[in-house]
Structure formats: C-alpha cells, structure tokens
Amino acid sequence: MSDQGNEHANHDGIDNAGLSAEVGSGPEAKRTRDEPPEQTASDEAVSNQSPDSTIGLSDAQVRAREAAKELLEYEFEGIIKIEAANGDGWRTVVELVERNAVPDTQDIIGRYEITLDATGSVTGYELLERYRRGDMKEEL
C-alpha cells in the first residue's frame, strides 16, 4: 500500500484511521484503542480506600475543600496551606468569601484552619482572621 494519497497510513502501510483496531495480544487483545484500559486490582484498591485507611496530601486537599463548603457555607476561595499535623492528620488553611462587595477589592475574606485526622475526617475548624481582599496581607 502506498503512503501517497492516504494521510492516515503510517510508514508500515497500516491504516491508523480505524481507531477500533485491536491492539496487543493475550487477554487484552479484545480491547480497542478507543477504550480505556481495565482497572487493575491495585487501581481499585486506591480508589476504594476503606474509611480506616490514611489519606495523602491530594485527598486531604479534596476533603478540606468539601468540609469548607459544607461546614462554613460561604463561597469557597481557595486552599492556601496544607501540612502534616504531627504525623497523625492534616492541618489546612482555606479562604472563603464571607461577603461580596463592589468593588471586589472590598470583599470580606475569612481565613479558616480545618484539621483532619489521618483518615480524612474533620476534627475541628477555627476562624484565624478576616480581612478585605484589597488589604496587603503577609502570607502565612
């Protein structure tokens, strides 16, 4: 087969336009290129963590965001700090818009600390400070 006139053919003369062509051999030979690979047992174990397993940094970030939205009921602005808390949990600092204003430099921002245990459950939260968005702030 010639490469001329067929922009989908590669140098081996194989037509790449048909993305449903079978790839590989063995048990995965039936999987097509446009299908995602099957999850392995280790992938499923990570995505289905038991409630007693410890969480990592990225899970702590997700849980802190969810907790801020649920517990504090203000518009979520962002997570500005996450750190391990004595090896048995996480300390996170989030910012929430407590009052919108015009101009937005006059918005009131609340900075809250949310603590999580090693499994990601919220163990407490505290308002650290409030400030206007336009005020110069020293970062944590």
From Swiss-Prot:
- Record localization: Gas vesicle; Cytoplasm
Q: Name a Pfam family for this protein.
A: GvpO
Residue ranges annotated as compositionally biased, kind Basic and acidic residues, are 1-14
Spans annotated as Disordered: 1-61
Full protein name:
Gas vesicle protein O
What upregulates this protein? Expressed from a single promoter upstream of gvpA; most transcripts stop at the gvpA terminator, with low read-through into downstream gvpC-gvpN-gvpO. Expression starts in early stationary phase and is maximal in stationary phase. Highly expressed in 25% salt, poorly expressed in 15% salt, no gas vesicles are formed at 15% salt.
The record's statement on gene disruption is: No longer makes gas vesicles in H.volcanii; cells translate GvpA but do not make gas vesicles.
Q: How does it assemble?
A: Forms homodimers, forms a GvpN-GvpO heterodimer, interacts with GvpC, GvpF, GvpI and GvpL, might interact with GvpA.
Q: Which InterPro entries match?
A: Gas-vesicle_GvpO (IPR008634)
Main localization category: other
Q: Does the keyword Cytoplasm apply?
A: yes
Q: Name one GO cellular component term.
A: cytoplasm
* UniProtKB keywords: Cytoplasm, Gas vesicle
Point out the gene that encodes the protein: gvpO
- Where is this chain compositionally biased, Polar residues type? 39-56
Q: Which family does it belong to?
A: Belongs to the gas vesicle GvpO family.
State the source organism's domain of life.
Archaea
Q: What else is known?
A: Encoded in a 14-gene locus called mc-vac.
Q: Tell me, which GO biological process terms does this entry list?
A: gas vesicle organization
